[in-house]
């Protein structure tokens, strides 16, 4: 056989043989070695060739087993794998295993490279023949002892195991020898990884399938000792080679396995156990809740957690799931050579149920090789023996090539704590070795809590630490050889297997974070097997393994290139601080290498960043951050591998918390990388601190002892108490994970998806979505990090489809996406040379960023309308990636969805550019900056708990400091990055559309329009500095990067160093290439024309809603009628053809769009107006307002049917759309009617009432004033609205009409001249804008509303706002004051008549007091009027001064009506002289008359003097104005009025002439023959008409004013002589009247009659018929009306519609009529007695010039149906004039 083995050296690897050959080889081996051997410890033991103990059935079998063991140990040539020196432990001095070692094996080499060389076919046959032999190493405590060999029989004695167990307990105090738990767990871990070996190597049919099927996780099994319903005891969870599979999904029932064979006695029992285990696993897979998908460290795949089986009475090295046999298991030791400690626990139980008929399993350890066999009383079938042999071969090969022989001789520490160290271990576990309790539940709960989570995610108090071992002379054996490995070595496959499964065996293994960080510190990284995500066991022998090694070498080169980045990101060593325990004792904590302690080894220099804690305290490693290029992991692999839940959550009552990193990524502003294990560790500690949970820092490397043995230790050691179970996972986290998982499967079809499309995945519920968003934002690493980039895009798209915006979620999700983008070697994939195969390839393909995912991401972010810092950077990164894809041709126009999503991405980016940047979140206080990133988030997701002590929080603060997830790009702001990404994206997109016309054909009409819109917006934003985003880019490009260096140097230190490897070490250095190389987007007209043509050709395919959208897009594109006429023409044709079928909402959108575009196509507008009229009854209030505002206010397009229908629908009681309008809508509605001069009394009244109903809470003062102004422009008066607005504006609410705010004191000259008196009566409310005051004053003047105190408030307001208003507003204020003042200076009052004195004489004495009070009131009124006249004169003078001092063109263009009226008023007041005094006043001497007459004469003289002063001031200011310009303005006004009122004036003048001819007087007749006017004209007293003349268009006051119809009469008033007979009824003579009157007053009456009879009065009268036209009618034509432009110097509401030139508003009416109406005024429509303010001013000016004015209203004249009615009205006018002349 040895010759065969020697010949087999250098042959092909054993595991690469064909499957058929392997089957034949194993069959021959099994036929040769049929009998199995049971090796039992203690009784019969023998040493075989280097310490292997073999229980033989015969010499031949023993020899075969020995040759097989020797072959598997020595002859196989292991492959070369470089091992880092810090992973190689010192050797053991007294172990004989070193004599049989090879040089390659001592260097950490394994079977992954070229292993198996030297194995021949005969060796394979011999190995298979010896597979049924079990070799176990006996427990050794010192030097190697010889052992006896015993022959195993089917019925072996039952006392050996119990004796061995009792000896071990009596010697060590608990169930395991020194190091037994750790070494035993190493065998378990090696057996755990055996299926990977089987999967990597070919196997016979029926064997590899069963071996590759993972066994049931222990959490799916019922607890030991509890009977099942079938009457059988439940199987205890075992840990064996079949327990580790490729994933953690549902597994098939474990095959019936006993290590080397099955006896007839145990065959049925094992089958039942397997069936029971399968049923339990299937049931658990359905009933168990999903585990938390916590992301593992980079390169590490999660594996199922294995629990300790010692408490359940099952041997750890048993591959099957067997029933516990009390008192039968013997403690044993086993060791596995390798750089990683694979620790487990042995089983020890009480002596109950000693009569149980069951087999036992033992194991012995020698030279690191452990082979276990069980032989029962019954025989085994060939299939079972084949499986057992296969398992034995795999186990031995694993232990040989991946394990290290030897064990620890370190003495036990004091206090009963056992720290087991081996020659190959770098960490130990204590939770797996549990005490031998009665039922084992306490130990199980303790171990479950410790090992149910991966190492990087365990609570800080329970994470395993790396103990130190004594150095120097104690390093012997294999460890001494291993210490000579080079420093650049790589981990072995055993380490890869250990790192691939986060927790192997019954306890936590070496912290993977330590491996990764140590590798990073050494400048290396883990094996390529880890990065490939494949099964680590012996995979290197296959092509996949070679590819993985090549990828690892490539990553090593990349790591070397970025070594500077990794070194910069490493934080300095954290200063150690004491950790407060439960008992208050603070142990000593050291940093770096500490003093050698018993049971601990010296740490190498590479692990100097770990904190070493004294005995009883776990060490918390603090690893430096790992750069993104050093940790490249497949995101889909981490996301798709769920983490199983420990059985503590199912079988025990203790809660279990899935403690996960909770570091928030909301503050990440740049590309981030994945969280390292140190970050996860600190985050878990922060979560624990935030939840207020204080855990017992029990030593995880020491096994738990029995109650009896550990009682003294518990009393003496404060840290021996078991740790409290972690809190359960919050329900909101579970719900959030479920919702996000369902949303991650959502595939959006377009950017218009709504909530309905989410129903198949996750039906939209606001509460559920909000809770999930809050949980994900609080714990992004737990809920968002496991998702891949396409899944994150699907989640954002789901929230966008639901319309649910949660800004913290968007920030956290963008941060996670940036981390994945940076951690995968750039967005979109890993290394270029890696070609993964199989499942890894599919996973990588699903995790990579795709074109669809990037477009979906951008579209969803734009739809949600949020642009924070992380979101902006993510959008910029996605834009750069899309531009690269388009540039390289990776995306080609080959599918319809590509065109759809390209258009959506362009639209989304342009939309994001236009969104305002979100306000940055204020940073936390410096004291709690580190804790705020993790602790508050964890506290929100956990139940309320007691706060942690201050000491614990203070000591844990440095441990919470985590490195940044990504290097901060301190170079540029997010806005600048967004602009740069937009430039690249739109440039490449335009080029792609230009080069590949297929993109156009993949877009429909809407998508082409959206793309055109996006390109237009990009040209505006990134074009030659016109836009907002381009300003920062090009200012920086022109001025260099110095500005950015000063403004963007916020991130220093680590962020700058991290950014150096990515394009910028500092702010200035990074800004230089960014700004200088920033391209500028140049608009491509050819591409835009192509897109416009594509959209135009597809307009007929659009529905009405899409047609409305096309209107909006064409508007926002800035297309004018002359730029792309074919687009508007096609749109017009489609709209006119389908106008009748368009719904109200699209109609409103179309009309509003055309209004903004100023489209004045009458046919197009008429079609839309008629369609709106037909749909008016179905329109909502806001749609009605939008349509009327567009037609009326913007386009000035008057459609009679449309406006009338709107008035009916809005104001009729049955419809009453006004009830649903707000103040702004009411204002716009009435403004549309005012703009088109469409008068609807019902609507105007209803609008005013609605505004009053809204009140001050529903409307503002400006809105109420605006409505009042619109009503004034329509000549509609609403008294209630007037009073409310005036009271609110000028503060007149407290002034009662009785008091009128009039001062009772005549006052001094100071009160007469200043505005203080006016301010005392009332002033404008403080804080109101000047435009509002001017608008209200204008409305009051136009509607002739003068409440008490208004003039005083107006004068005070004018003095206050005069310096702040323009010329137009000054003219409006002066016009309002002039109109509201009433009388003018030098105007005669009714009290100046001659008969007033006689009436006072005739008053009785009883009325003397009332007369005195009335006289006092009259004097008060006269004084107030005098005061107002002074203020008015001052205002007019200041107005003329401002008019002459202005530099603008004079006369000003608008509002010209007020300027003309003011100029006419000033001219009239300055040039007209007051009429002469009456004749009787001139004839009487100055000394005669009563006292009243004397006072009246004094007042007349005073008023004449004041009139002279006023005239002098006005003349001086008028002379300063250019005379020619003023004459030209007056001439224009005169001609316009003459042309407008010429026909009507001639008609009135002809009727007046006809009436005067009836009373014609013959000029040749003498005074005796003249006839008086008819008595029915005059009444008493009679008068005689001497002459009359009628003319039209008479100019008065030096041409400043025009009289419409002038009538000049000469009459003689007095008593006729008695001899003269008058026509008609006779009249009584004066004498007869004297004789008839009796009484005391007879003498006075006779004197008066004699005076009038002796002095007849002859008087010349000037009668002015002032024609008052109605407001101009609205234009009845559909011709568009241009909107009026405001004056350059005017602003505010004073330059509104009423202050504009009427000719510019209504071209439908003649210009002359419009100007005449503005100059002369018109009647108020809803008032029969009041003229407008302009008409009142004209009448007062004519009266001041000496004319008797009779207003003639157009409405009254038009109502006269016949000539007789017209003559009767003219007679009434003449009668009124004659009566006024006779008084």
Curated annotation (Swiss-Prot):
<feature type="region of interest" description="Disordered">
    <location>
        <begin position="420"/>
        <end position="484"/>
    </location>
</feature>
<feature type="compositionally biased region" description="Low complexity">
    <location>
        <begin position="277"/>
        <end position="289"/>
    </location>
</feature>
<feature type="region of interest" description="Disordered">
    <location>
        <begin position="97"/>
        <end position="378"/>
    </location>
</feature>
<comment type="subunit">
    <text>Part of a 1700 kDa complex that includes the precursor RNA to exon 1 and the tscA RNA.</text>
</comment>
<feature type="compositionally biased region" description="Low complexity">
    <location>
        <begin position="577"/>
        <end position="599"/>
    </location>
</feature>
<feature type="region of interest" description="Disordered">
    <location>
        <begin position="1476"/>
        <end position="1506"/>
    </location>
</feature>
<keyword id="KW-0508">mRNA splicing</keyword>
<comment type="function">
    <text>Required for trans-splicing of exons 1 and 2 of the chloroplast encoded psaA mRNA (a group II intron). May be required for stability of the chloroplast RNA-protein complex in which it is found.</text>
</comment>
<dbReference type="GO" id="GO:0008380">
    <property type="term" value="P:RNA splicing"/>
</dbReference>
<dbReference type="InterPro" id="IPR013584">
    <property type="entry name" value="RAP"/>
</dbReference>
<feature type="compositionally biased region" description="Low complexity">
    <location>
        <begin position="655"/>
        <end position="669"/>
    </location>
</feature>
<dbReference type="InterPro" id="IPR052886">
    <property type="entry name" value="LCS_TC/CRSF"/>
</dbReference>
<feature type="compositionally biased region" description="Low complexity">
    <location>
        <begin position="928"/>
        <end position="970"/>
    </location>
</feature>
<feature type="compositionally biased region" description="Low complexity">
    <location>
        <begin position="126"/>
        <end position="157"/>
    </location>
</feature>
<feature type="region of interest" description="Disordered">
    <location>
        <begin position="1395"/>
        <end position="1427"/>
    </location>
</feature>
<feature type="transit peptide" description="Chloroplast">
    <location>
        <begin position="1"/>
        <end position="40"/>
    </location>
</feature>
<feature type="domain" description="RAP">
    <location>
        <begin position="1713"/>
        <end position="1772"/>
    </location>
</feature>
<keyword id="KW-0150">Chloroplast</keyword>
<feature type="compositionally biased region" description="Low complexity">
    <location>
        <begin position="676"/>
        <end position="709"/>
    </location>
</feature>
<keyword id="KW-0934">Plastid</keyword>
<feature type="region of interest" description="Disordered">
    <location>
        <begin position="1620"/>
        <end position="1639"/>
    </location>
</feature>
<feature type="region of interest" description="Disordered">
    <location>
        <begin position="918"/>
        <end position="971"/>
    </location>
</feature>
<keyword id="KW-0809">Transit peptide</keyword>
<feature type="region of interest" description="Disordered">
    <location>
        <begin position="652"/>
        <end position="709"/>
    </location>
</feature>
<protein>
    <recommendedName>
        <fullName>Trans-splicing factor Raa3, chloroplastic</fullName>
    </recommendedName>
</protein>
<feature type="compositionally biased region" description="Low complexity">
    <location>
        <begin position="343"/>
        <end position="374"/>
    </location>
</feature>
<dbReference type="GO" id="GO:0006397">
    <property type="term" value="P:mRNA processing"/>
</dbReference>
<feature type="compositionally biased region" description="Low complexity">
    <location>
        <begin position="224"/>
        <end position="242"/>
    </location>
</feature>
<dbReference type="GO" id="GO:0009570">
    <property type="term" value="C:chloroplast stroma"/>
</dbReference>
<feature type="compositionally biased region" description="Low complexity">
    <location>
        <begin position="420"/>
        <end position="436"/>
    </location>
</feature>
<feature type="compositionally biased region" description="Low complexity">
    <location>
        <begin position="1403"/>
        <end position="1417"/>
    </location>
</feature>
<keyword id="KW-0507">mRNA processing</keyword>
<feature type="region of interest" description="Disordered">
    <location>
        <begin position="563"/>
        <end position="610"/>
    </location>
</feature>
<feature type="compositionally biased region" description="Low complexity">
    <location>
        <begin position="186"/>
        <end position="205"/>
    </location>
</feature>
<feature type="compositionally biased region" description="Basic and acidic residues">
    <location>
        <begin position="256"/>
        <end position="273"/>
    </location>
</feature>
<feature type="compositionally biased region" description="Basic residues">
    <location>
        <begin position="1494"/>
        <end position="1506"/>
    </location>
</feature>
<feature type="compositionally biased region" description="Polar residues">
    <location>
        <begin position="307"/>
        <end position="316"/>
    </location>
</feature>
<feature type="compositionally biased region" description="Gly residues">
    <location>
        <begin position="105"/>
        <end position="118"/>
    </location>
</feature>
<feature type="compositionally biased region" description="Basic residues">
    <location>
        <begin position="1620"/>
        <end position="1630"/>
    </location>
</feature>
